[in-house]
Amino acid sequence: MFLKRRSTKGHELTRNVVSEVWCDFVDRVSSRLRQQPHRECVSLWLTMLLLALAILFGVAPATVAQSKPDKDYLVYVLSEAADTISLIRFGPGGARVDHEVPTGDMPIDIDGPHGIAISRDQEFYYVSLAHGRPFGTVWKYSTKDDRVLGRTTLGLFPATMDLSRDGSLLYVVNFNLHGDMAPSSVSVVATEPMLEVARIQTCAMPHGSRLNPQGTRHYSVCMMDDMLVEIDTATLKVSRHFLLTKGREMGMSGPPVAKKTDGPPAKHLDMGGHGMEPPKPGDISCSPTWAQPSTSGSSIFVACNKSDEIVEVDAAKWSVTRRIPARPGVYNLAITKDGTHLLATNKRDQSVSIIELKSGRELARIPTRRKVLHGVVVSPDDRYAFVSVEGVGSEPGTVEIIDLAALKIVASVDVPEEAAGIEFLRIEPAK
C-alpha cells in the first residue's frame, strides 16, 4: 500500500525534528528525574524511550482502531480510455476487480464511458458514453448480468448524471467538452422506454448533475460561465441560476441569458485538460465542476476548480453562505450520509480532502498513489469512501478505498486506463 512509501529525505527530516524535540524534552525533565526514587526514574525513562522509538519509526498506536470489513462492498467504476465497466469488490480479503464489462459500439474510436448512476432498487445502472458521431448516448444495464437493456442518443459529450427518487427519470448534462463555447443543456430521459423527454438549455459546459434529497430540484454547474443552475423537476425548466465568481456573486431567477458566440473562440477557453489547468495570473474565475446538495437540501456545495475553494450556497436565500478553502483543482464532491462531512477530490493536488462541514475545517488531506483525481462515492454506512483516479498516459486507472474512521487509504486496486465515473452498488455477505 502506497502509504508505506516514504522518501529517505522526508524520513531524515522527521528524525532530525524528533531528535531536537526529544533532546529539549530530556533537558527539561532531567533535573526532575534526579529527585525521583530509582524505580520511578527507570520506569519513566523506559516510557519516554518507547515513545521516542514509536514516533521515530512510525509505530505509534492509531487514534482510531482500524478493522477489516466483515462484508463485501460493491462499486462500479468506468474507464473512459478503455471503454470498460469494472465491478470492484472490497471485503475481508481486500479489494479486487470482480469482473469487467466492455461497453460502446465504435469498432475503432473510443466511446468514452464517463458518468454512471444506479437505481435505488439496485436493479439497473446507466452509463453515459461521451464520444459519438458526433452525439453521445446513455445505455441502460441490468445489475444481475450486465446485459444492455436499452439506449438513447443525447447531446454533445453527455457526462455526469443523476436519477429521480423513483428511478423513472435520468438527468444527464451534455458537457460538450470539444465543441464551441455555446450554451449546452441537460437531457431528461424516461428510463422505462429509454427516451429523451426534454432537453433543457443551461450554459456553457455543464457538469456535476445532482438532485436534492427531496427530488424537487436539480443542480448542475457550468465551467465556462461560472454558474450554478437550478431546474424545477416539476416543470422541467430552469428556475434560478447563480453567478459564482468571487466579488460578482449574484442569484437570479429564470435561465441564464445566452451569450453571443460570434467571432473566433477566446484563447482562455481551452479545456482539453478538463480541470487540470491552473488559473492564469489575475484569473478570479471559479470554473465550477460539481454541485452537491446537502443531506437536508438546504445548501448546495460547489467545487470551484480554478479558485481552489468550495462555495456553499443557501438554497432558500439563494446567496453565498461561505467559501471554504480547498486544495488545488478541487473537482468532485460527496457528502457522508449523516451530513457531517464533505469529501473532495483534488485533481491537481493528487489528494482527497475530508472536510468537517460544521467548521469548514479540513480534517485530513489524503495523498493518492497516482495523479489526476476524478470521482468519489461514500458507502451507505459512512464507513468507506471509494475514489477513482485517472492516472497519466499508459498508467492504469485506480480505485483507492479510504477508511473514514482512520482517515487513511486501506486498499487500492488497478482498473483499465482513465478511471472516471464511480458509483456504489450495494453491501452484501462476504464471498
Where are each of the predicted segments found?
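C-terminal segment of classical bacterial N-terminal signal peptides
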Residues: 54-63
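Generic detector of short, well-ordered, non-transmembrane alpha-helical segments enriched
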Residues: 4-7, 61, 314
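Short, low-complexity, charge-dense intrinsically disordered segments
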Residues: 4-34, 39-44, 53
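Predominantly soluble domains enriched in secretory-pathway, periplasmic, or organellar proteins
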Residues: 63-431
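Residue-level detector of intrinsically disordered terminal segments
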Residues: 46-50, 54, 193
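Short, isolated positions within intrinsically disordered regulatory regions of eukaryotic proteins
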Residues: 7, 19, 26-27, 49, ...
